[in-house]
Amino acid sequence: MTSTGDPRGRTDGLGWVSRAVFGDDRIGLTVDGAPPAGHRVLARYTVVPSVERARFLLPRGATRATAAALLAYNALRPPKIRAVRAGLGALARIGVLDAARFPTLTVSLPADVDPAGALLAAHLAELLGVRPAYAACGIRPPDPHHKPTLQVFAADGRPLGYAKIGWNDATRALVTAECAALRALPQASGVDGHPVTPRLLAELTWAGQVVAVVEPLPLAVRGVPVDDPPRIGALLAVARRGGAPAAPRPLAGSTFLARLTTEAARAAAADDTMATATAGSGVEQSGTSRAGGGERAGARAVEAVAALARRHGDTAVEFGHWHGDWVPWNLGRHAGNLVAWDWEHSGPDVPLGFDLAHDAFQRALVLDGQPAGAAAAAVDAHLAAHGAALGLSAAGRRLVADAYLVEMWLRTWRLAAGGAGWNPALHPALLDVVEKRHSG
């Protein structure tokens, strides 16, 4: 095989993941080559299937850990991906992957450098108290919305933890938010209908990145069907953190409306600089636009929030927490309980019903490939069918739908402002939808 240079200089998925996982400049990385002079080898990874089409970094020399990296939680994956991972996992279990002619990534450090102070995987092994520990990582095309995640396993294949890496402003904010949510959830987890949630094991600042180390899910967890009906009890428990209902309050004067107003004003102030901020992210973006996404989008958001207040200011609803990304692919079942993960968009003080609205919106947008307007109509239909079970009146359901759509556009703006670029499925289409609803 031909030796190649340090993959951190690449612009593809392998380069993106390598920069995130091996960010310390003291780390030597070589593909099918010897480490730099004076370095000692700390780890080797199999690059599957090739450098140019890399999809996995799998640890070498630990067949059970490598197999577990491919097979753990496979029941949660779509059938085609499940089949590929099952085949590779079977090969890993009998040691064939290590013997196959896949490229090998060698990780090294100068002899006098403590691995736990430079290598994230070594630091995680020390933090989790298991040595040796082995890390694996999936690879996808570079995307400023996504976070490389290290899966850490013991030599016997036991999952020890998952480390999400926030590497730009947008993803650092998401990882920080998930850490805050997980710190607050243990008392409610599994109580009075609240879904079971993985524990936060640690929050780290590492090589300029923010890292959330999260407890593994139960190995026997199974996904919920994509057509699973709303779990009203769980939605109420999440909103109330397992506690009692809060008294309804009008939208006018709420801290929720105040936050939307502040965020829209920030978006308006950034109208003239957004294109420069997004273009400066330094990542070849996938599924996002590097441009500012339309003139005066922030000013339009200011008017959208004002119109929301005019239209619904007197309507009273219960406010509470939300998961923030309540969709079938973030939910599972284990031992008779609902399990929920990926809490990075969670937050307090939103109208009760936001998670129900989000579920409908994302099913239509992601699963059915519908445009933003059709996804908004799906929100209306879902709330009409199930909102009463949450205690929402007809006026409350209309408030929740309209407020949720504004919230979603502001989320889209926050990600773009953090360097993730505009999501073309949501901008400018979602602003157009909001304006049309408010003018109707």
What is the predicted function of each stretch?
Residues 70-138:
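Juxta-kinase regulatory segment immediately upstream of eukaryotic protein kinase catalytic domains
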Residues 127-155:
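ATP-binding glycine-rich phosphate-binding loop
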Residues 147-152, 310-354:
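Active-site acidic catalytic loop and adjacent metal/ATP-binding pocket
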Residues 150-177:
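ATP-binding glycine-rich loop module of kinase domains
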Residues 181-192, 218-263, 302-316, 324:
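Conserved kinase catalytic-core helix
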Residues 199-208:
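Short beta-strand micro-motifs within the conserved protein kinase catalytic domain, predominantly
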Residues 209-219:
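Conserved short submotifs of the Hanks-type protein kinase catalytic core
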Residues 354-391, 405-418:
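Active-site activation/catalytic loop segments of kinase-like enzymes and analogous catalytic loops
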